[in-house]
């Protein structure tokens, strides 16, 4: 399936939306994906990012699977991120039927070597991709056991399929998406540091019902009406807490 929603067509986005709604999660927006998947392209795993007012817990989901799509894990991070920018590597495999390959193994390996590295890949994209401002990508391509392995910091529209045809056959048309698989994507350290984890504190902090933290700050959750009391007159209480914990954000529980 393609990622973006099209009328009368199944897509990752529409199926993911259905799965969330099946779990009673109706308020969310901005579904972004970490790795590009064109029409007919498979994905063994991908990362999807949404902004939602719901506190979504993996353990409490009644439905984790829908036709061809399964939620494996949920992490909480910051809102309104440019999510694809926080992914450092994408890994794809293109497995084209051997009988359709025209180039020799030597020629294929030579093409892989020539196309690996930091290059301007404008000629290996679609008309849509040509309109993008930046066409420079850092990519490694290898040919092993009849498959092309692509690893890169990002890929242009149709880039892997056009490069695959050039490497295997010397042709610049995109090969079919059905032979392409997104294998996995790698987080950046920055995104890793933004992920919020629940904290269990031995000492009780008055008015604080729950604590989450990432590498940058703590979030102290309080019941409605208790925020002012936790912060204290002229911020006295929160200043003392910041001396102990560092940066703190105070939020009222919904």
Which positions does each model-derived feature cover?
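Core RNA-modification/binding signature centered on pseudouridine synthases
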Residues: 1-45, 52-54, 79, 115-203, ...
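A short linear hydrophobic-aromatic micro-motif
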Residues: 30-33, 70, 206-211
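RNA pseudouridine synthases
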Residues: 36-53, 57-124, 158-159
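Generic marker of residues within folded, mature protein domains
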Residues: 84, 102, 131, 172, ...
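Residue-level marker of intrinsically disordered, low-complexity segments enriched
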Residues: 106, 209, 246-248
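Interdomain boundary/hinge elements
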Residues: 248-254
